Design a protein with these regions (language model features):
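C-terminal motif of bacterial Sec signal peptides marking the signal peptidase cleavage site
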Residues: 15-19
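Positively charged n-region of N-terminal signal peptides that target proteins for export
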Residues: 1-5, 22
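Sec-dependent N-terminal signal peptides
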Residues: 7-13
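Beta-rich interaction/scaffold domains
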Residues: 20-152
């Protein structure tokens, strides 16, 4: 019983010694960055094997990005891809209308598709330029155009 009393007393002291300071705290700046800083193109396809955990057919993913350019003034991010990483047997099945694009954006920013653009990170139609609204933590917004094209 004595042990429980000491444990309860220790918890009581711990709760009372914490602070509920609500004023005099340093104001921190919110991030104002709303840029696309990196981008990648991937191709996903079904492999021959089975996933041992689920028993489903395995899904393979191949990295395709070869070059990137960022035009901050015009808010255009271009990703050029090469299909040389795709296995020869699968290469004929590649189409931009089912490519997967993933991007990195400024710290604490959010991104959402606009004007019918596909969601990022899942297969989507990249045969056309797509627009995304990037919102910084401080509320600043920019509309970015992502262009996916073959690398020549």
């Amino acid at each position: 019983m004595k042990k429980y009393f000491y444990l309860l007393a220790a918890m009581f002291v711990a709760v009372l010694s914490t602070s509920c300071l609500e004023s005099g705290l340093e104001e921190l700046d919110e991030y104002s960055g709303c840029d696309i800083t990196n981008g990648n193109v991937y191709w996903r396809y079904y492999g021959d094997g089975k996933n041992p955990a689920s028993g489903e057919q395995e899904v393979k993913q191949v990295y395709l990005a070869a070059a990137r350019t960022q035009d901050v003034d015009n808010c255009v991010y271009t990703i050029r891809y090469t299909t040389s990483n795709i296995p020869e047997a699968e290469r004929a099945n590649f189409t931009e209308s089912k490519a997967v694009v993933a991007v990195t954006i400024s710290t604490a920013a959010t991104i959402k598709p606009i004007n019918g653009a596909p969601k990022l990170g899942v297969p989507g139609d990249w045969t056309k330029d797509n627009q995304y609204e990037v919102t910084a933590a401080d509320g600043t917004k920019k509309t970015w155009t992502i262009v996916v094209e073959p690398y020549n």
